[in-house]
Amino acid sequence: MLKRSMNIADYDPVLWQAIQDENRRQEEHIELIASENYASPRVMEAQGSQFTNKYAEGYPGKRYYGGCEYADIVEQLAIDRAKELFHADYVNVQPHSGSQANAAVYGALLQPHDTILGMSLAHGGHLTHGASVSFSGKIYNAVQYGITAEGLIDYEDVRQKALECKPKMIVAGFSAYSQVVDWAKMREIADEVGAYLFVDMAHVAGLIAAGVYPSPLPHAHVVTTTTHKTLGGPRGGLILSAAKDEDLYKKLQSSVFPANQGGPLVHVIAAKAVCFKEALEPEYKVYQQQVVKNAKAMVDVFKQRGYNVVSNGTENHLFLVDLVSHGLTGKAADAALGSANITVNKNAVPNDPQKPFVTSGIRVGTPSITRRGFKEAESAELAGWMCDVLDAMGKDNEAQVIAQTKEKVLAICKRLPVYA
């Protein structure tokens, strides 16, 4: 018999200590990784529910197992809320991750060796948009587009590449692009060459849900997202469309199950349902507006302090700092800031002279700091601290500056906890 008094602390103290250490790390470090966020206690409660135990192969009303009546309620709730949130007429909440959602879209609409045209990973795209090390670059003939010296998508270059390679699908979306994508222009190019337009909006889904960033739904044939970045929900994936194409929807349904996945994670779908309900609340829009304000405030400080920001600014939740002119690598900057309890990630910049695991830039994102209550003033102050650390790298006072910055970080983290 399983007793509710069972706990990890008594049974597995080594694992329990790692959990406690991670809890402390999140509370005492400032999180600036653009793809991370803090899930609400409600979301985590759903993920820890007894839906963890339930197998539910199939879809609501069409399951292969019995006892799915409550799983059906949960999944339909998530579907209906996502439809309302994103103004979609098709939603699949079963993908376990964004990459698996993308794989399902490719599987539904492409054959092996078909040509896809996606944004280069080195220029801000994602592994699954055709990178050679990804399944998307191995199974399909992947052609890549990039950004200009100013850090902007060159739509005429995208068009010319599309006319040359005649892709079956154009992939729009990004993991490190700080400007607004012209979804309508991308659809225009796709239509010109007879291609599907597939948009991966994982990074900006929360902004889109709040109306802070343009939605690709009116333009794309199909859209995917994760649920844990700007959306702030559980780790998972989502497929959506507003194409009013039942044949397309049938292909997508069967590509998720049974082609790419077996049983869905019902406890995670329950958490997605909670996340979508939270995103429909009025205060969610205020949060997403603040995410962008905070990013802009940080950009202003970096520029004032003499650091080059790719594309010269941001219109979303993230930005890239190019460290080439300062003679710093992204790897070293990541480590130095990490020593001051500021977590970023190293990131390639356009025409990066360094290797992918070294890089010449850092990516900075504001969803997490905004979640814990940072406004423009705190964000600008934080950017100043980061510049202090970067300025001191390689100098005699580096250790002293890092120690002083860490004290400031610990103080503001105590004042603005993640979970109060």
Curated annotation (Swiss-Prot):
One of its GO terms (molecular function) is glycine hydroxymethyltransferase activity. It catalyses: (6R)-5,10-methylene-5,6,7,8-tetrahydrofolate + glycine + H2O = (6S)-5,6,7,8-tetrahydrofolate + L-serine. Pathway: One-carbon metabolism; tetrahydrofolate interconversion; Amino-acid biosynthesis; glycine biosynthesis; glycine from L-serine: step 1/1. SUPFAM superfamilies: PLP-dependent transferases. This is Serine hydroxymethyltransferase. Pfam families: SHMT (PF00464). HAMAP family: SHMT. The modification N6-(pyridoxal phosphate)lysine is found at residue 229. Its EC number is 2.1.2.1. (6S)-5,6,7,8-tetrahydrofolate binds at residues 121, 125-127. It is found in: Cytoplasm. PROSITE patterns: SHMT. InterPro entries: PyrdxlP-dep_Trfase, PyrdxlP-dep_Trfase_major, PyrdxlP-dep_Trfase_small, Ser_HO-MeTrfase, Ser_HO-MeTrfase-like, Ser_HO-MeTrfase_PLP_BS, SHMT-like_dom. Its cofactor is pyridoxal 5'-phosphate. It is an enzyme of class 2 (transferase). Belongs to the SHMT family. Catalyzes the reversible interconversion of serine and glycine with tetrahydrofolate (THF) serving as the one-carbon carrier. This reaction serves as the major source of one-carbon groups required for the biosynthesis of purines, thymidylate, methionine, and other important biomolecules. Also exhibits THF-independent aldolase activity toward beta-hydroxyamino acids, producing glycine and aldehydes, via a retro-aldol mechanism. The record marks 228 as: Plays an important role in substrate specificity. Keywords: Amino-acid biosynthesis, Cytoplasm, One-carbon metabolism, Pyridoxal phosphate, Transferase. GO terms for biological process: glycine biosynthetic process from serine; tetrahydrofolate interconversion.
